[in-house]
Amino acid sequence: RRSSDLPVEGENEEGLTDRSLLDMKSIWNFINTVDVVDIKEVIGRQIEYNTAIADEGLRGDYGANIGSVLLSAYGDDVRTRAKARAAAGSDARMNGCELPVIINAGSGNQGMTCSLPVLEYAKELNVTEEKKYRALALSNLTAIHQKTGIGRLSAYCGAVSAGAAAGAGIAYLCGGGYEEVIHTVVNALAIVSGMVCDGAKASCAAKIAASVDAGILGYNMYLNGQQFYAGD
């Protein structure tokens, strides 16, 4: 009997968190109305831990040093820093650094990807602490929401969905409303959604940089009156 003829059982999600209740409108309403005190502990821990490993990734010699390469090759504007810090966190995590990371959807790389670029833009724009926490809630929930359709274990590169989520958080920080946020996500996914996961390793950092770049480009596309449609 050929292996291709063997029956394949579907994902068993019994007892796991039900994410099907999430949609972008509900996420948007939540992040704009939640008392920041209620999310400050968990988001604050993400800020502390993920910032620390990004700093270490830029200080040390890890993997291909994608974060450092980005800053050296392209300068230190906010867009480059946003990509570099997310990549640097992955440089460290994928190459032996034992510092803890606050995950998203079960993944450290995705946790760093949907938080560190948003933090860099929050610093650049000098937004209030409240706005920063709301932006991070948006990016984290947007990343989780996308995984509802992707699944918990998939050949789809999770950096892609997390990069799009970072774009959503950045759009919010820059003053974008609901339409800007959702079109940012759609545009970002149209750019890099063909990327597959080929394992957790050093090259994840470069995939993260590309995905964050797509998130930022997706937002700038919509600002300039451009967007991808079905089939594009």
What are these regions (language model features)?
Residues 93-103, 143-153, 196-201:
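Glycine/charged-rich beta-loop-alpha catalytic/anionic-binding loops adjacent to active sites
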Residues 97-116, 157-162:
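Conserved phosphate/anionic-ligand binding catalytic regions in large, soluble enzymes, centered on
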Residues 77-96, 128-146, 186-194:
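Acidic-glycine-rich active-site phosphate/pyrophosphate-binding loop
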Residues 152-153, 157, 161-182:
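C-terminal structural cap/anchor segments
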Residues 63, 72-75, 89, 93-102, ...:
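Soluble metallo-hydrolase cores and metallopeptidase-like ectodomains found primarily
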Residues 10, 18-75, 81, 175-232:
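Functionally critical mobile loop/hinge segments
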Residues 2-3:
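Short, small-residue-biased leader/transition segments that mark boundaries at the very start
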Residues 111-127, 168-175:
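Alpha-helical support elements that line or immediately flank enzyme active sites
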